[in-house]
């Protein structure tokens, strides 16, 4: 059928149909929904988008077939083709996404964060589950700067009120 876009895939290919995130930790996570929302910016491969209950790539392949049949057919502008281009699952990009999620968390105080992913492929459709364990969050309570040079310590003591880290961000 014209809707079966799987026929265009190679034997080792599948469509990426979903990216899910599961955040679980034995430590309190105060901003779970904010973390999930921020992760949306770090996907190396976004999941397939839908239009009228059909994956967008169905329209992409239908358009490609029309072009083969009628080469002089008016071409879509490049932007529309890109929007409907199929998302083929790439395990390297899933691994990079996991690494990016970990780095994001580590920069926000979750120094022992771990992120693993599991990809399940069935009938040329892949679903990826990212399992996120932020671990404990580290907060700075006190920053103490001690200089062995008394002149340097005097400069540090004079400038300690001009700190760049506001107390409420700790």
PLM ranges: what are they?
Residues 4-170:
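Interaction-mediating elements
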